[in-house]
């Protein structure tokens, strides 16, 4: 429903973009002033604008994958084209009509210059966004839990999240992630949800990816919880349509994790090696198959030995105070992507108490990672893909 309501806005944005770009082209090439010369630019614009819709309705296969990738790249480019063109228009309005500089700024020559500057900014932002999205950084944290653990003064946990295996992310990105993880000599590796990108059939060569993930080295193994995208649900430009149906993961997703030697925690916890608890929560909005309502923080810790460290894995950084009050020591999350693309990296901070990074709530440490993968536009601008090795220091025995 939201996608349908926003469709006119999307169409208007593309129309506005076409008018402004063609205005700039005409400033350089006067023969584009006639309507018949608009045919090719209009056709290209229409193809790019409709690519996400075409991909949505195509059957699974190579054509759909290509159209999906084109659409995802276009969404990212469109954002920066709109930002650049709107900024140029506002500046032109200010300098040419509000301030007394019309004779300087409202000219064909200035139109050409403004267009070239916009094109350069768009090109740099888009290329950097694509390249930057493929570079996985290492963001370390150190926290202290005031509890003793027999035979252990510290432990290294590597947090990753938001793999989004599908059209954007495949084996190459996973191999880089595994290489970064294995450099850390981890005691424990955890994946805080959104392993998949809504559609199982979008995962290319799942057997190869599972084999790559099996090569993760960790003393206590690899554990995961599901996120809001770990369900089988067609998505159009980030929006879904089957609102009345219960959202569930494809059983093949579960089998994939088993094949990858990843233990899925679905509203359940484990006492690992008799030393610490690890609890994996289902997603707050889409708990998935067989779970109607996830357990509350108090229900999670009820019956646990609170003299032992309690680590919670939760896709979305929610209920932070409640988890702290319930006795949780460390809460590890993802979901936000840190906004993924400017200006989202600024606005995301208005939506979450901890949009990315570290926050302490009472005695609890909350860490939110920006994730490894991507959702929607195949770019990262102003954010980074990352893994987070967390060194947990315990009280001395």
Put a short name on every predicted segment:
Residues 17, 22-23, 81, 87, ...:
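Residue-level detector of solvent-exposed, low-hydrophobicity positions
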Residues 147-397:
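Soluble catalytic domains of enzymes that build or remodel membrane lipids, polysaccharides, and related
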Residues 40-42, 57-59, 108-110, 145-149, ...:
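Short, functional N-terminal and low-complexity linear motifs
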Residues 1-134:
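Non-catalytic terminal accessory segments
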Residues 133-148:
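Alpha-helical transmembrane signal-anchor/signal-peptide segments
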């Amino acid at each position: 429903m939201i996608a349908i309501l926003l469709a006119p806005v999307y169409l208007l944005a593309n129309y506005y973009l076409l008018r402004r770009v063609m205005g700039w082209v005409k400033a350089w090439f006067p023969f584009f002033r006639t309507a018949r010369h608009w045919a090719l630019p209009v056709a290209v614009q229409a193809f790019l604008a409709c690519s996400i819709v075409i991909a949505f309705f195509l059957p699974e296969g190579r054509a759909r994958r290509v159209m999906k990738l084109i659409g995802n790249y276009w969404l990212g480019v469109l954002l920066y084209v709109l930002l650049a063109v709107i900024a140029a228009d506002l500046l032109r309005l200010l300098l040419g009509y509000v301030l007394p500089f019309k004779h300087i700024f409202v000219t064909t020559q200035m139109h050409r210059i403004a267009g070239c500057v916009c094109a350069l900014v768009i090109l740099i932002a888009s290329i950097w966004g694509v390249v930057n999205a493929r570079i996985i950084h290492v963001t370390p944290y150190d926290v202290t839990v005031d509890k003793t653990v027999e035979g252990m003064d510290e432990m290294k946990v590597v947090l990753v999240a938001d793999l989004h295996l599908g059209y954007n992310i495949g084996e190459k990105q996973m191999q880089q992630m595994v290489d970064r993880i294995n450099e850390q000599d981890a005691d424990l590796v955890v994946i805080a949800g959104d392993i998949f990108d809504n559609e199982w059939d979008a995962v290319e060569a799942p057997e190869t990816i599972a084999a790559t993930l099996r090569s993760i080295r960790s003393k206590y193994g690899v554990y995961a919880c599901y996120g809001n995208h770990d369900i089988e649900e067609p998505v159009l430009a980030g929006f879904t349509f089957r609102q009345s149906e219960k959202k569930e993961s494809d059983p093949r997703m579960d089998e994939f994790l088993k094949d990858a030697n990843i233990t899925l925690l679905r509203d359940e916890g484990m006492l690992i090696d008799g030393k610490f608890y690890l609890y994996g929560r289902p997603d707050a909005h889409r708990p998935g198959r067989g779970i109607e309502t996830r357990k509350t923080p108090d229900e999670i810790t009820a019956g646990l030995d609170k003299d032992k460290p309690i680590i919670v894995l939760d896709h979305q950084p929610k209920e932070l105070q409640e988890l702290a009050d319930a006795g949780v020591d460390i809460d590890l999350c993802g979901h936000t992507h840190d906004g993924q693309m400017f200006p989202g990296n600024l606005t995301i901070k208005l939506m979450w108490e901890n949009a990315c990074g570290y926050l302490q709530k009472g005695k609890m440490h909350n860490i939110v990672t920006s994730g490894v993968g991507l959702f929607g536009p195949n770019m990262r601008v102003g954010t980074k893909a990352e893994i987070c090795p967390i060194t947990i220091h315990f009280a001395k025995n």
